[in-house]
Amino acid sequence: MKNILIVDDVKGWRDFCSNVMFEIFGSDINVETADCAKAAYDLLLQAHPYDVIITDLQMEDDFSPKYAGEWLVEQIKSFNRYNNTNIIMISASYNIRHIAEVLEVKCIPKSTALKCLSAYKEALGVN
């Protein structure tokens, strides 16, 4: 069973990404969601390790000058147990590709995310 964490401040996006994960992996997954980076961080500390983490880039403003998603990815990467976790950053931000490249994670612009299931499959390495 795959454990998946979806982090976004917009419930509609959390629901959409959850549905996409069920479509890709079937029903043998456990999906948890968080509405902000801080809540996601708390889950990282107490939950079982996640195989896939999908996070929005822009959420709460508490991490200025960084984006909340940027801060969260840095925290995830500081845990050894997440070394093999697929991390996907989603955002409508114009600079998502640059930030994802610096953080060494996959990214999907939200404009593509709505239209293209294959973008998720490609980011996850799934056929």
Over which residues does each language-model region extend?
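Active-site residues of response regulator receiver
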Residues: 56-62
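Output/docking surface of receiver
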Residues: 6-12, 33-35, 90-96, 101-127
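Two-component/phosphorelay signaling modules centered on CheY-like receiver
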Residues: 11-32
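Extreme N-terminal starter segment of soluble prokaryotic enzymes
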Residues: 1-4
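Acidic, metal-coordinating helix/loop segments flanking the phosphotransfer/catalytic sites
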Residues: 18-19, 33-52, 56
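His-Asp phosphorelay/catalytic-motif detector in bacterial-type signaling
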Residues: 49-51, 80-86
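Short amphipathic alpha-helix used as the core "switch/output" element in two-component signaling
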Residues: 64-83
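Short, well-ordered coil/turn elements that cap or connect secondary structure elements
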Residues: 26-28, 82-84, 102
